[in-house]
């Protein structure tokens, strides 16, 4: 089947010579198979893949095909639909966004296209602000430079959830050849009012909304200039919006890492533009030590995720995990709302099923409900929309362990601009009390327990890798796991079958979440591990968590637990 697809591409009158030339130069049969054995699929992050020729690659044809499916879906479900499109600093992002825009315009869908790169959360905001029926961001988030991607948003500004994604993919799969993809020239699209370039008006509205999320306004007005911040946009789209928000709030002491300031899809200072990686902060650390900075921020290329390093004193800085930053923000937001008399009775904090249980302890302390959703911020965005529709709950904060955070409800995806603003305010608050952000974290641990999490990613690329991941999880699903190193398994949660099983009493109940190929095992000491395929990369992810009685104890416990769990996982691979 892949051979036939390969030949179809070579013989197509639509495919350009550059793409055909790339295909002809492939001498490895396995490489041809990998490029054509499937079409790119929607995962937790939408469409994502290596840039290149082939049906399983990101190129203007696969982008246009997906977009034609999206256009057909929109025209079937809405009258006179419109779509907002943004893109990040990656190679081919601008070209892919233009290809998508022209396919939509040719299909009669009005397009609002940003005239230059913008963060993903700004796109989410613009969908709502412009009353669009959909949105597209061309980005591969934090993936290596050879990747690009394409995230689709619904009329509420959130990433499309499973039902809508399935309909869009189904519509795209009905397109059997590239001749069915509509196109139009840019000039004609503009002339017909089907393509409108946007920019500053949206930026201004968005910036005002972000600034309005400040909780302790007097503190910020009085002391913002005292906080020393080092910021790196890691060659991405965050540079202008993050610095603009901070500057307008009075944070005068923000210095950017010059070598990582300019947008650049080759990411020349790093192999992996991921704020989870300590390596991306090496240049920022040098600056921070010279400036005695209070905090370091780094945002990924599409500026929806943020990494944080905090000053420990004596010229040392500690990188916070996504879970640690989430705990600090959960506590800061809830305590500040309570102190200022703004904490609602029906408030909710939302986290994903692989995110720290420490947040539950904090929320319970403030009588705030905490809600678990599947991995992927789109499920948090979906809940915000449900709350706004029913009016029975008030969204306060949401986060996931992979460095994504959101306060406010005018954006429906994780937002590193909002997070940077809140983390700056939080750092300022603790500084005024004479303690660092790290000391504040230790106080939380002392109060609620020393939670420690870890993540093991097992890379298994290509068709064979994908099959191995599926087989491993299926094998684990069928295995009756009673204990890990002598510690009993209390609960097994199978999110694919949507069954929560009490392993002690053999009782079962339904999980009220959409089906997803995820397994979670909770042990009697409160530790747990989760296994799932990555939705955006050729990896299997194993999440681990323990709760210790000290930092040292938690560190040793997570290592012991990881060894035992990975021996179980590896035996299934």
For each of these PLM feature ranges, what is it?
Residues 293-295, 316-318, 336-532, 539-541, ...:
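Phosphate-binding and adjacent anionic-ligand microenvironments
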Residues 36-56, 140-141, 233-245, 301, ...:
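Conserved phosphate/anionic-ligand binding catalytic regions in large, soluble enzymes, centered on
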Residues 2-100, 107, 189, 195-225, ...:
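An N-terminal, well-structured beta->alpha segment
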Residues 31-36, 40, 148-280, 288:
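Gly/Ser/Thr-enriched, mixed-charge loops and adjacent short helices
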Residues 82-88, 228-231, 406, 545:
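Short glycine-rich or small-residue beta-strand-to-loop segments that form or flank ligand, phosphate
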Residues 84-147, 248, 252-308:
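N-terminal small/polar loop signature for handling phosphorylated ligands or for N-terminal nucleophile
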Residues 96-104, 147-154, 304-324, 359-362:
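Short Gly/Thr/Asp-enriched flexible loops that form oxyanion-binding sites at enzyme active sites
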Residues 115-176, 274-298, 327-333, 348-359, ...:
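Phosphate/diphosphate-binding loops
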């Amino acid at each position: 089947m892949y051979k036939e697809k390969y030949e179809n591409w070579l013989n197509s009158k639509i495919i350009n010579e550059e793409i055909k030339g790339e295909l002809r130069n492939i001498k490895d049969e396995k490489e041809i198979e990998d490029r054509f054995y499937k079409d790119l699929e929607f995962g937790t992050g939408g469409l994502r893949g290596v840039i290149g020729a082939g049906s399983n690659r990101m190129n203007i044809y696969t982008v246009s095909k997906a977009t034609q499916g999206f256009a057909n879906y929109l025209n079937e479900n809405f009258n006179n639909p419109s779509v907002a499109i943004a893109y990040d600093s990656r190679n081919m992002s601008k070209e892919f966004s233009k290809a998508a825009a022209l396919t939509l315009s040719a299909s009669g869908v009005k397009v609002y296209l940003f005239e230059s790169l913008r963060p993903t959360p700004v796109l989410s905001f613009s969908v709502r602000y412009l009353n669009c029926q959909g949105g597209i961001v061309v980005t591969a988030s934090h993936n290596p430079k050879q990747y690009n991607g394409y995230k689709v948003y619904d009329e509420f500004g959130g990433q499309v959830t499973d039902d809508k994604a399935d309909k869009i993919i189904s519509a795209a799969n009905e397109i059997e050849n590239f001749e069915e993809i509509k196109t139009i020239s840019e000039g004609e699209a503009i002339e017909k009012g089907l393509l409108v370039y946007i920019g500053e008006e949206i930026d201004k509205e968005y910036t005002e909304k972000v600034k309005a999320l400040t909780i302790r306004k007097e503190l910020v007005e009085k002391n913002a200039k005292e906080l020393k911040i080092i910021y790196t946009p890691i060659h991405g789209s965050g540079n202008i919006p993050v610095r603009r928000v901070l500057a307008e709030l009075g944070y005068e002491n923000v210095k950017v890492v010059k070598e990582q300031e300019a947008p650049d899809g080759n990411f020349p200072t790093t192999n992996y533009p991921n704020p989870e990686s300590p390596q991306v902060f090496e240049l920022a650390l040098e600056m921070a030590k010279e400036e005695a900075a209070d905090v370091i921020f780094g945002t990924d290329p599409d500026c929806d995720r943020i990494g944080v390093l905090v000053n420990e004193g004596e010229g040392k800085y500690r990188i916070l995990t996504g879970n640690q930053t989430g705990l600090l923000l959960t506590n800061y937001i809830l305590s500040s709302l309570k102190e200022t008399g703004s904490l609602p009775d029906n408030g909710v904090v939302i986290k994903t099923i692989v995110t720290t249980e420490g947040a539950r302890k904090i929320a319970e302390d403030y009588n705030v409900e905490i809600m678990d959703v599947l991995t992927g911020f789109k499920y948090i965005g979906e809940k915000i929309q449900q709350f706004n529709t029913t009016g029975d709950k008030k969204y306060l904060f949401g986060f996931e362990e992979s460095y994504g955070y959101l306060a406010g409800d005018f954006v429906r995806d994780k937002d590193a601009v909002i997070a940077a603003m809140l983390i700056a305010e939080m750092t300022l608050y603790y500084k005024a009390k004479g303690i660092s952000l790290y000391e504040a974290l230790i106080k939380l641990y002392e109060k609620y327990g020393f939670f420690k999490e870890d993540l093991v990613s097992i890379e298994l690329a290509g068709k064979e890798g994908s099959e191995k991941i599926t087989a491993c999880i299926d094998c684990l699903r069928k295995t009756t796991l009673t204990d890990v190193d002598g510690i009993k398994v209390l609960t097994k949660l199978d999110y694919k079958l949507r069954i929560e099983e009490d392993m002690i009493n053999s009782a079962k109940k339904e999980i009220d979440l959409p089906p997803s190929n995820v397994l979670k095992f909770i042990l009697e000491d409160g530790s747990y591990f989760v296994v799932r395929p990555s939705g955006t990369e050729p990896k299997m992810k194993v999440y681990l968590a323990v709760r210790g009685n000290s930092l040292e104890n938690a560190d040793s416990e997570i290592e012991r637990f990881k060894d035992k769990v990975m021996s179980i996982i590896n035996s299934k691979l």
